[in-house]
A protein has these predicted regions:
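Catalytic-loop region of hydrolases
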Residues: 22-99, 113
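N-terminal cap/lid subdomain of alpha/beta-hydrolase-fold enzymes
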Residues: 84, 89-158
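Cap/lid segment of the alpha/beta-hydrolase catalytic domain
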Residues: 118-120, 131-182, 233-234, 238-245, ...
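Short glycine-enriched nucleophile-adjacent loop
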Residues: 203-214, 220
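Alpha/beta-hydrolase-fold enzymes
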Residues: 216, 222-315
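Short beta-strand/loop motif that positions the catalytic acidic residue
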Residues: 351, 357-359
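Conserved alpha/beta-hydrolase "acid-adjacent" motif
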Residues: 364-370
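Catalytic active-site module of serine/aspartate enzymes centered on a nucleophile-bearing elbow/loop
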Residues: 381-413
Length: 413
């Protein structure tokens, strides 16, 4: 497997002493001269992979929201939301589409890698000229989630006292994140979106948009997501949190002044999460019990599947922040669209948007029952299932199926 062969970062480097900062492996080095290679080189002496002021903004624009009241009763001062747009807003302002990213995504939904964007757009198969979400017809908006680390205010951002927020950053909820996105819609002059679409954790925000702001969402697409977080999902999230906070270089969340951050903890959290993003059948078919190169697992070497997880852990380190991982994971854990609305069925039953619910048949993170609940309880909903060996990530990998499903839905809008 090409992925399994990269593996420069290892979560269990034989003989590496974790208490020695110099022993911490760096992310796998991409091709020489690529945007990713420059990012990795620049981050080699940094405790975070977050985008920071002074970095190339790429296509990002920034909305200064100011003081942001939170559901907890706290106020987040100096709030900024990073976002990107594609296409033109029609004179009637009726062609806007909001695309909401998942846990470790960002605003770069479509487009090539380049300065400010170390990776190509994460959903370019669905968004772009001539795609199902056609940027020649629609005005597409995507923001980096509040609490994230790719330009929006988060724990790695500078607090009013001039220091990074770190451990002082307040906990956020899905409703806080959606409220910030409503401020963006207001600033762009968008009263209602023709379509709000979100997958995975992005689907949490999408359903919250429709439940909390029904007049602002005409069509809704909920992909591989749920109305509330299940106990199984809470358990996986908890393990990822523990992996980060147990890293001795976490420093209780205040690691920004140190040369090394909690890279092993963040890498382990990513490896745990990535396991839930793929299916057992795919991992067995793809890797089986094959050894990684000439490594021998009998004497401490790795299986290919271990190298594969190491590779994905290392990739994340170059572009993400451990505190943001905790903040956004927390918002996933407390997600419950029915809270304060009479319960889940009542909240979903009040949604007025024409709705598409998409699930993946091999998804072991968001189970079919969650899609069934959404489709059953939302009045004007239809459900489609993606057939895939790839598990939760099937919504990204099965591009042809997703394209056909979304085109069918939008044709009736």
């Amino acid at each position: 497997s090409p992925d399994a062969a990269v593996g420069a970062f290892s979560l269990r480097t034989p003989g590496a002493g974790h208490n020695d900062p110099m022993s911490v492996s760096q992310p796998p080095a991409p091709g020489v001269g690529s945007a990713s290679a420059k990012l990795v080189d620049r981050r080699a002496g940094s405790p975070t992979g977050a985008w920071r002021p002074g970095d190339d903004p790429g296509r990002r624009r920034f909305l200064e929201i100011g003081d942001m009241p939170l559901e907890s009763g706290e106020v987040l001062p100096g709030t900024v939301l990073a976002f990107e747009t594609w296409g033109e807003l029609a004179p009637r302002r009726d062609n806007a589409v909001l695309v909401l990213h998942a846990l470790t995504g960002d605003s770069h939904v479509t487009g090539e890698a380049g300065p400010g964007h170390p990776t190509a757009g994460w959903w370019g198969t669905l968004v772009g000229p001539g795609r199902a979400i056609d940027t020649e017809r629609h005005f597409v908006v995507a923001a980096n989630i509040l609490g994230g680390c790719q330009g929006s205010t988060g724990p790695s951002s500078t607090a009013p006292d001039g220091r990074p927020w770190g451990s002082r950053f307040p906990w956020l909820t899905t409703r806080d994140q959606v409220e910030a996105e409503t401020r963006l819609a207001d600033a762009l002059g968008i009263d209602a979106f023709h379509l709000v679409i979100g997958a995975s954790l992005g689907g949490h925000r999408a359903v919250e948009w429709a439940a909390g702001h029904p007049g602002r969402v005409r069509n809704l697409a909920l992909v591989a997501t749920g109305a509330s977080t299940t106990a199984d999902q809470l358990a996986w999230c908890h393990l990822q949190e523990l992996a980060i906070v147990a890293d001795p270089y976490f420093f209780d969340g205040d690691y920004y002044s140190h040369a090394v951050g909690p890279v092993r903890g963040l890498g382990l959290a990513r490896a745990l999460a990535h396991t839930t993003y793929r299916s057992a059948a795919e991992l067995d078919a793809r890797f089986g019990r094959a050894h990684q190169g000439d490594e021998d697992p009998a004497v401490g070497g790795r299986y290919q599947v271990e190298s594969y997880l190491d590779h994905h852990a290392g990739k994340l380190l170059a572009r993400f922040d451990a505190n943001s991982y905790l903040i956004v994971t927390h918002s996933m854990m407390v997600h419950d669209v029915g809270a304060g609305r009479g319960g889940t069925e009542a909240a979903l039953g009040a949604i007025t948007a024409r709705t598409l619910v998409v699930d993946v048949d091999s998804d072991r993170l968001f189970l079919p029952g969650q899609a069934e609940q959404l489709a059953r309880c939302i009045p004007d909903a239809r459900r489609r299932t993606v057939a895939s060996l790839h598990g939760h990530d099937g919504f990204l990998i099965e591009a042809d199926q997703m394209d056909a499903i979304l085109r069918e839905f939008l044709a009736g809008a």
